[in-house]
């Protein structure tokens, strides 16, 4: 009797089968397209950002090839290429989710910002593979739904039914989608049963170490929004240098973020929330207060970074739909809600660069 295959072999076989099913599904088998299951993409919760991972990164933002990530937005003119010889896009990437995890925020933002290109940055290999497979499955499902809707619309177009077809177009599309799509389960949550704005063509994910290569991907003032959701708190003092919020990294975020752009943060650790506020100049700790009284170069440098951001008021946050998605759509946000924990939100607006003195 042949023993059952080991867990790793099961995971590899499942991933291969899922990828093939997504790429080879025909126009008539919408129900066969399913989202990947997380249990086959397990990985450790953390990755050391200071290790020398085998990462591919562009020489500069002008060398980055985005064409494979957003095929629906590739410039139709083949002569429009970047410095690396890759096809250009019709628009630039302008929304970034740093540490995108399993892609909950990307999926939630896709229909909310259908005209904006959104990218998730993740350092863990298996997690990135899950997000990529998930996005491909959602895109394939949307393509099948569009084809089914177009077929149903063409069949119903007669002179006597034209007005009724116009009035009931959306209802027919929803009914066709519901009939073709399976009911969501625990492993296939958020499976869309109707067409969504953008059809998930505006989201993608890349493997990258943000702490090392963030400026290699994004040019000055390119981004309109940056999301940092439930980052690793690194509780030990000797590990604070690995936190994704710091004076140095905040300066890089300010470089890529355009004036008026927003940097969103959310955490369930109150101490880390105050760390964020201190590093954006909203709060002052004991060390910062002593530095302010001194004339050390370090104090001046910290003040310079803090002058680039201002905190967004609570009144504005209540009207911002992205804040709601950040709280409710992310996997960590759902886990905190299940455990009835607290969520600490802070959003900062990029100020206009000060003018050079005359």
From Swiss-Prot:
One of its GO terms (cellular component) is tRNA methyltransferase complex. The active site is at residue 232. Gene3D superfamilies: Vaccinia Virus protein VP39. Residues 1-29, 151-194 are annotated as: Disordered. GO terms for molecular function: tRNA (guanine(46)-N7)-methyltransferase activity; tRNA binding. It comes from the Eukaryota. It catalyses: guanosine(46) in tRNA + S-adenosyl-L-methionine = N(7)-methylguanosine(46) in tRNA + S-adenosyl-L-homocysteine. Pathway: tRNA modification; N(7)-methylguanine-tRNA biosynthesis. It is found in: Nucleus. The keyword Cytoplasm does not apply. Pfam families: Methyltransf_4. Its main location: nucleus. The keyword Lipid biosynthesis does not apply. Keywords: Methyltransferase, Nucleus, RNA-binding, S-adenosyl-L-methionine, Transferase, tRNA processing, tRNA-binding. InterPro entries: SAM-dependent_MTases_sf, Trm8_euk, tRNA_(Gua-N-7)_MeTrfase_Trmb. Its EC number is 2.1.1.33. Residues 151-186 have a biased composition (Low complexity). S-adenosyl-L-methionine binds at residues 99, 122-123, 209-210, 229, 330-332. Catalyzes the formation of N(7)-methylguanine at position 46 (m7G46) in tRNA. HAMAP family: tRNA_methyltr_TrmB_euk. Belongs to the class I-like SAM-binding methyltransferase superfamily. TrmB family. Forms a complex with trm82. This is tRNA (guanine-N(7)-)-methyltransferase. It comes from Aspergillus fumigatus (strain CBS 144.89 / FGSC A1163 / CEA10) (Neosartorya fumigata). The lineage of its organism: Eukaryota, Fungi, Dikarya, Ascomycota, Pezizomycotina.
